[in-house]
Amino acid sequence: MQTGDFVNHAGMRANNTMTFYGQEKVAYNAQLCLMNMAVHGLTGRIKSGDEANTFYHDAHNLNGKCDYVMANPPFNVDKVKAESAEAADRLPFGMPAINKNKEVSNANYLWISYFYSYLNDHGRAGFVMPSSATDSSRKDKDIREALIKTGHVDVIISVANNFFYTKSLPCTLWFFDKRKSEELQDKVLFIDARNYYTVVDRTLNEWSDWQLKNLNAIVWLYRGETDEYRELISDYYTALESDDDFASIKDALEKKIQDKQKEAKEAVEAAKRKEKKVVQAKFDEEIAALDEKLTIAKEAIWLTEKFGEGIYADIPGLCKVADRKTILEEKGASLTPGAYVGVAPEEDDGVDFTERMKEIHQELLELQKESNELMNTISKNMEEMGL
């Protein structure tokens, strides 16, 4: 549904520009899918039943035919019949590990193989995997090595906890690209976004629209697509309704919010009792609008402090471009972003440690003195009371 919304938002009609295919073993789930698509004005070819079990059948004969593959498969599926899975083909890098019961006990690399296999010669894929899949061992590692050698692994992004309603564990986004430019064939972009997100509530995180744009911007610059980056910077200025530098805009917004909060407090105190809630609601709405702009300004600063006018750079703790030799020989074919980007340097808060410790020590001495004086006063009062 979101893919259709994305295409429609871009000015194209999803039903005219895309063909949606799906297969699902459980018929009820397939019916839900069709109903959901109909509600959103989309149509699709969805097959269901045993003949639509993805592990054992390519129900639409899509192997090698897809321009784009997007997927959020179930993680760590077990008890997949190895013989049936192998007979269904779509395994360009071979079978994952098979247990004594002749089953695949973890199907993550079956999914990865399928997504790659479905692509045509210029296809692209993007999908979600558990974080463990980026450096799992044994046969998984063999498949991963073969995959890396193709030069089609494009971007790997680590995602924080709580991005799914049903799973709290961190995950990883994988992107394949069979039409990578010649200069990028030997490279993979790693992004560690585990510390970059917006908290929705105690159990759910997400990327805001501007955060998604910022992550896209990193990929654009990696690919040399600087026009898209400049357009995003222009969008920031438009949203902020100012031509000042982003830091100045941020400072001005913070000042406006402080002033508005002070004004709200005074207005509520001066309002009649029955009008207080109405007055407060009016100011809350105005402050929320300013807060939204402040958030946008902070995201603009986050991006431009790292990439300036639009030149890609490896940022410790955030992003790193690595070549295949480094990945295969130095990192043991690991695709874990954290193994490449490292740790972000701690920000200098401008406080001299020695001087601050002296200040704290002096504060403690003064507090101790006040405490002693208070105890003496209490003791004296108790004596006067004959206690």
What is each model feature region?
Residues 30, 100-176:
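Conserved Class I SAM-dependent methyltransferase catalytic core
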Residues 327-351, 355:
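Amphipathic alpha-helical/coiled-coil segments positioned at domain termini
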Residues 80-106, 131-139, 160-166, 202-210, ...:
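Short, contiguous acidic/charged loop-to-helix segments that flank catalytic cores in large enzymes
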